[in-house]
Amino acid sequence: MKKIAILLLALVSLAAAPQSASAQFDISKVLGGLFGGSSKSTTTELATASTPYTKLADAAPAITSLYGTWSYSSASFASLGSNPLADVVLAQLDPIVLDVLKNMGVSEGSARLKIESGKGLIWQGSSSQNFKYTYERSKARIVLSTVINSKSVSVSGYIKYASPKVSVMLDVKELIKAIKTIYPEYQNDQNLVLVETLVRDMNDVYAVGVFTKL
């Protein structure tokens, strides 16, 4: 990628990056072996019973708690749904993502995130990206929007805060859509197609970036 996209867009940049040695994991085999014909999640967001979503909402921080500058710590995938096989597959994807981020020069402490009222900035070295956001504390829900390559994109997700760290959880399907919008040359990229296939019938899958308060 030529510049940093909104927050965690880099988490699924494996779709836009060359295959690395660790990327030899065959996602298609996992799809056939683990999921068979159907793998739809049955999770209902903010359902009556206690769910990961209600727990996030109950612990949602005041937005002012997030103001300031944060340092990138780590990245991973996570599932908040009820599909027991999701974690198995996502655990295999994590090392691939970390390897891609490493090849991009993204490592602990290498990127910064600044959050202000309704807006923010993320940067690494000389590359930076402004974004805007809305935050619904009753659900711990956040929607990020930005303009990259003259194209507007938005991605929704959730915030999890445990001082001094904040986890930004963004919907993987929306991230893939954002990549396709910003970088149409990756529409048919093999890695992107595989990841998209992986999550197509799985709801509640998120790219998680952890940042530490400076």
Q: What is each PLM-predicted segment?
A:
Residues 2-4, 20-93, 189-214:
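Amphipathic/hydrophobic helical signal segments and adjacent flexible N-terminal regions
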Residues 4-5, 116:
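Residue-level detector of intrinsically disordered/flexible regions characterized by low predicted structural confidence
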Residues 7-9, 152-153:
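Short alpha-helical segments and helix-capping/turn motifs at coil-helix boundaries
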Residues 8-16:
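Bacterial N-terminal signal peptides
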Residues 12, 59, 102, 122-124, ...:
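Residues embedded in well-ordered secondary-structure elements
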Residues 52-57, 97-108:
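N-terminal post-signal-peptidase region of extra-cytosolic proteins
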Residues 75-80, 101-184, 212-213:
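Contiguous, well-ordered beta-strand patches that form the walls/edges
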Residues 92-97, 115:
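Short Pro/Gly-enriched beta-strand edge/turn motifs at strand-loop
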